[in-house]
Amino acid sequence: MAEHNGGGNPSARQTAAEAWHDYWKWDRVRWGTHRVNCYPGSCPFRVYAKDGRVIREEIACNIPQIIDPEYRAPDYNPRGCQKGYQHSRAMYGAERLLYPMKRKGERGSGSWERITWDQAFDEIGAKLADIIQSHGPQSIIIDQGTNGAGVLRGGGEGAGAGLATQLGGVSLDLNFSIGDFLPGQYLTFGQFQQCPGVENWFLADTVLVYGNPVYACISDYHYVLEARYRGSKVVQISPDKSPSAQFADMWLPVNWSSDPALWLGLCRILIDKGWIDFEFIKEQTDLPVLVRKDDGRFLREADLKEGGDAEQFYVIDAATGKLEALAKGTLQMECDRVLEGTVEVRLKDGTRVEAVTVFTLLRKRVAEYTPERVYEIAGVHPDQLEKLAEWCRPPRRIFFFSAAFPGKMYHGDLCERGACYVLALTGNVGKAGTGSHGWSAGAEFNAGSGFVGSMPPEILESDDPIGGALNTTQKLQEAYKTMFAMDPTMPVLEAAQGMLREGMKTTGTLSPPALFWYYHAGYKDVWDKHLEDPNAPRKISAYVEEAVANGWLQGYDMLAKEGSNPKALFVSGGNPLRRTRGGMNTYVRTVWPKLDLIVVMDPRWSTTALHADYALPAASFYEYADTKFSCPNTRFSNFTDESVPMRGESKSDRQIIHGILRATTAELKKRGIKSYTAGPREIDVDKIMWRATYGNKYGDSNADEERLVDDAYRALGEVGWFTSLDGEKLDLANLRKNGGSWLSGRPTFPAMVAQNADMVAGEVFWCFRDQVEQKVPYVTTTRRIEFYLDHPWFIEADEHLVRYKQPPYIGGHQPMRLTSGHLRWSIHSNWVTAEEMLKLHRGEPFAFINSAVASGRGIADHDYIRVFNDYGNFMVRAKLTECVRPDQLVIYHAWEPYQYPNWMPYDGLLPGPVKGLHFAGGYRHYQYMLWNWSPAQEDRHTSIDIEKAAFQG
């Protein structure tokens, strides 16, 4: 055999061997992770560098094993995916933004000039001073994304939040910008941010799967596969045979938006056969609670006597047949409750009405959904439905993986509520191997500039402003119970939510993006025109106007007020021209001409950056020390160290924002402006930088910022929110030693309080233990799991109980429906143009189309097709498959618009209407707060048609 690279020459062979060995040598190795929203992420890496350049990374299996004394589960290691494995190449890719850039030509023309940081800061500061002086600070809009979300030095909810806090601008709530709110769980439990550990999936006997976790949860899905080895059944519910369906024991190919019929048919079988947990539903749910027959509202004490409590509800005492007040401060039952029954009551005006239990109404509702009708509506055969009921029969443990799509589908709330019905009826809440999940993060953000920078002066003047801010949250919760609500029976979570809600109102810096879209981005007319819902009693505009008029968004409605006039847009860690439905259609055409200033901070050239006035290079993940947000799903907080210096002239997001703040304050002072009004606040110009630097304690140098990380984690450890992996003191040195820390205990940030359970390092974790074990109430109107929604809007729409509703027509009456999901080769648009990822697929956007349909329309594999509806159109490559429905087109999200012909992505034909009911307010848990309860754009099942395109590429 011939010798490779040198034939028979020994010296040549030695040179090749030496070169190969030299390739695997490095100068330094550091801990690393990737601060993107690949939730839950938490993937630890070792990063290898040589000659000032990162040469590779590999998964570090340093997450301690689960050693729960009661529940055995596989450990987390290894955690990682192909996106993380190639970042060492992507950070040197052609799309990397390395220098401050200023637009020369028209926006989006591609004409740029390189400028210095001083010029960028001075020009942006002068323009911001103009805007503050002429239009007010609330005309500055901050769009925070999730990429680059370093807790203390990164973008998005990290340092990015400080820009709104200090200048008085308006930050758009990122959870509704990206559409990851889960309305069905929120309506049922009063919260959606409960996040059991991913190891909890392994303990389930039946796993109900929405979405496509094989693509979206690469690091976690092994728990589902391992659960099958112990006999668990996996049920995939999706209209197409997704990649996740091949690993399921049962695939239910449901018709469009027909999931509520499936769940109600399942509930019917469970109830008729007595396969429900009677004690659980009596104690934990509203099923025994009485509802007035005349108006469909809960029976309240205020109905029965003058001055009665409007939040005191009733059940029927099974022993006496009389009314019994439902306890507020505990779930402990004061008597045995009647589940199915009717009682006549005398109202305060002397009239008599009948009241009926919610369970009675539920039985009537589910009776409509016979197996035959479910088959007709949903396409699920009666035999499958019966088998599913057997797999959900108590005492089997059921876990519901909802993914993130319910918040992106018009009737996704009904779909999700239906699944929650099944969980509650069978008692599958608050126990190991049961429940559902949302997403949760944020314990570390209480050490960030958005929170600490808003603290009272005495805290910022102290020696430990971060520790002072963290300790303040607990005091504020107790104060909210007494001073604000005057209700000592209030659950801790409700107090935490109230504290955050009222606190953020006082800053005037947060708004639901729906108000921005509706009042300023052109969607008011688009939504009313391109949404046709035969079951909706009103147009979207009617819901918006009533909600605003009723003051349901008071304190967050600055963008709905007369005179509101956005003039500047800052984008940190986001990409709104890609992410917003209709982004390259209505959004850019309407918003861009209104803006005097558009600034994007990003490590790469995104579509939004290419349409900005200034593109500022943010440092990448391996270039400075910080951590990624932690979450209860893994309880592991990853640390990323500086493996190499920041590339080019890039800076941390915190350094960029401080440069902008410093230049803006200098310009304001030059003009003699000492203070200005920002909503409810008065901004002292002299104090802007003082607050941003926590009382001038942390400057902008790398050493200063590392000291900030050090002090923040020391403080987080001292309050017990995080613990080190080795039991030693938590600080930067410990993070550098171990690569991370444990999220633990009960952090008082509301998204953490929502777990309703202690987080113990190394133990299996599940949520709602407080409710099941300690009888702590839920944070709903009745303080129980709510099957019934008695808000007038939901009663009017006949959604007080779950029901099937046909999907609306979005975009027209075309014969096909468009669906989407998370792309396998990127995290949102991060890495979507990375060379290594492009090698793993066709290298450009493509859409899955049914092979038979394509053949009938003369479309071959890889042809360009034109996809269109009444709102817009785009072109994309066709990828033929038998795995999608004949009336379906599947295109995964996150391709950059500039990867499509004419820069028009699939979002260009998505009018993205919101569901008007989600503007409901005025009740205990129908109140907006950060990340919770607001409409998001709905895009799943948009109406489309296709044809072969003449475009050749």
Predicted features and spans:
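N-terminal leader/propeptide and maturation segments of large enzyme subunits in energy/redox metabolism
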Residues: 94-119, 123, 268, 273-382, ...
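Glycine-rich phosphate/diphosphate-binding loops that line cofactor/substrate pockets in enzymes
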Residues: 120-141, 197-204, 364-366, 386-399, ...
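Conserved short loop/turn motifs at secondary-structure junctions
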Residues: 143-151, 373-380, 403-411, 442-443, ...
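Extended redox/cofactor-interaction regions of prokaryotic respiratory oxidoreductases
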Residues: 155-235, 338-346, 358-364, 376, ...
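Short beta-alpha connecting loops at secondary-structure transitions
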Residues: 248-254, 622-623, 636-647
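Long, contiguous, secondary-structure-rich segments that constitute the structural scaffold
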Residues: 2-13, 653-711, 715-725, 829, ...
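N-terminal export/assembly segments and adjacent metallocofactor-ligating motifs
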Residues: 1-341, 372, 458-505, 512, ...
